[in-house]
Amino acid sequence: MNNYMNKKTTALLVSFLISCTLNAQSYISIHDKAIVVDTHNDILTTCFEKKYSFDQDLKGKTHSDLNRMRAGGIDVQVFSIWCDGLQQNPYAYANRQIDTLYAWVARNPSAMMMVKKPSELIQAVKQHKLAAMMGMEGGHMIENDINKLDSLYNRGVRYMTLTWNNSNPWATSAMEETTDSLLHQPKGLSEFGKRIIRRMNELGMIVDLSHVGEQTFWDVL
């Protein structure tokens, strides 16, 4: 009886292990066939501020670098451009981060490609290069100037988070809508904010509502 039970247990264990192996193979197959896109990674700002090189081994310093992204099967990386609301000259600060990303791509032409449109993305994937895109986390970086929005779009920024934790003159953030920091100031989008949304729609730029206040959310819709 014990011998029978041992054989049965062994058979079940083997079946389980085979199933796990097949599932793992299925996962790898699906991952390899898919275009894997990470739409937000703060590595650009981290490297810019700490003077790290993304194309070097950053284990122990950051959660990702170029080699780890490629090993992990990331096909498209949207690099986040960020600064807090206290940063002086945030538009220039954003552009320096963009310059950093362009420098990475220039140093690694066989591994990375800057993409601004779908056809370029597909080209990068077919060439087994990391397709580099950009998103901007905080509308304060356009400094209340639609022309600066256009300029950032032309450089490759394809989404803008309307606010970070700080509000700006044309949109209020979730943090400030839910605290007393706004006092009696209006919440949501201003008329200029609505112009910003219309311009983003004209450009085909994604309107990211992360971090925005509830009134801003409804005003955008």
Regions found by a protein language model. Name each.
Residues 1-29:
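Bacterial Sec-dependent N-terminal signal peptides
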Residues 6-10, 42, 46, 212:
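A generic signature of intrinsically disordered, low-complexity regions enriched in glycine/proline
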Residues 144-154, 176-221:
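Histidine/acidic residue-rich metal-binding segments in metalloenzymes
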Residues 7-8, 158, 199:
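Basic side chains
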Residues 25-183, 221:
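N-terminal hydrophobic targeting/anchoring segments and the immediately downstream early-domain regions
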Residues 17-18, 50, 218:
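Alpha-helical transmembrane segments and their juxtamembrane interfaces
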